[in-house]
Amino acid sequence: MNWITNYVRPKINSMLGRREVPENLWIKCPETGEMVFHRDLEENKWVIPQSGFHMKMPAKARLKDLFDGGIYEAFPQPKVAQDPLKFRDSKKYSDRLRDSRAKTELEDTIVAGLGQVQGIKLVAVAHEFNFIGGSLGIAAGEAIVKAFERAIAEKCPLVMFPASGGARMQEGILSLMQLPRTTVALNMLKEAGLPYIVVLTNPTTGGVTASYAMLGDIHMAEPGAEIGFAGKRVIEQTLREKLPEGFQTSEYLLEHGMVDMVVKRHDIPETLARVLNILMKKPAKAVKRDTATELAPLPVAASA
């Protein structure tokens, strides 16, 4: 099939003067089956106009949409060891990295930057789900740690947009090490008296849920997002019983006190600004924190 698709069909189209039509010109709504032109979807922040279904949003587009005027300082991707375990399943891990980089034009799954949201300076971190399922590995962990350290240095809050299947299995224990590393960095931000807000997006699962995704001061969630540790099917097979309707969705978690609010994507910047304005105002008798002491950087899990 690949030989026909990659060689024969282009030759025939060339002879007949036909042009290849990109496969992603039209996007189908998973909920209603509605077909939406890709430009219309992008202009509507990757939300299906009729149904309101929230599609996965690219990390770069999310930060551009979040910050005032789409202007922000993008953080460089830290250099770490590539494929330290020389892992291979049905495909070499090094090949998966190369393919994901070509597909997303990113070095790894984390995109982070410093900018302003309605005049409030903050650091934002977003997962790119199209990069190996937004999984947390050495590079992603190091990028998150650096983002927390930058927020502390700038004395500003940090907003996290997780979208991940969990820890990156191709990096084994080195991937799992990022759970405590990112948690330590998160606690450094809290010790500095700075807010940490998490905006849970679809999906947020696995080790990411077991660490920084559920440790925010405030937890927002986009409508219909899948949020949990293990998948619904795995839980049902383990417990041998049917789970409640809507289990592991944003709305279910809001009803059961796991998230503070469900916010539509179009309303996120305004809602963040309103919440941060409240959190950043110091009470009249607030105890002054000493943040002058320089915080030592966390050790890198594996260096290049």
UniProtKB/Swiss-Prot annotation:
Keyword annotations from UniProtKB, A to Z = ATP-binding, Cytoplasm, Fatty acid biosynthesis, Fatty acid metabolism, Lipid biosynthesis, Lipid metabolism, Nucleotide-binding, Transferase
Q: Which InterPro entries match?
A: AcCoA_carboxyl_beta, Acetyl_CoA_COase_Trfase_b_su, ClpP/crotonase-like_dom_sf, COA_CT_N
Residues forming the CoA carboxyltransferase N-terminal domain are: 25-294
| Chemical reaction(s) catalysed | N(6)-carboxybiotinyl-L-lysyl-[protein] + acetyl-CoA = N(6)-biotinyl-L-lysyl-[protein] + malonyl-CoA
The protein's Enzyme Commission number: 2.1.3.15
- The residues forming the signal peptide are none
GO (cellular component) term, any one: acetate CoA-transferase complex
Disulfide connectivity?
Answer: none
For molecular function, the Gene Ontology terms on record are:
acetyl-CoA carboxylase activity; ATP binding; carboxyl- or carbamoyltransferase activity
Q: Show the Gene3D superfamilies listed in the entry.
A: 2-enoyl-CoA Hydratase, Chain A, domain 1 (3.90.226.10)
UniProt keyword annotation of Lipid metabolism present: yes
EC category name:
transferase
What is stated as this protein's family in its record? Answer: Belongs to the AccD/PCCB family.
Protein's job:
Component of the acetyl coenzyme A carboxylase (ACC) complex. Biotin carboxylase (BC) catalyzes the carboxylation of biotin on its carrier protein (BCCP) and then the CO(2) group is transferred by the transcarboxylase to acetyl-CoA to form malonyl-CoA.
HAMAP family registered for this protein in UniProt = AcetylCoA_CT_beta (MF_01395)
Question: What name does UniProt use for this protein?
Answer: Acetyl-coenzyme A carboxylase carboxyl transferase subunit beta
The protein's organism comes out as Rhizobium meliloti (strain 1021) (Ensifer meliloti)
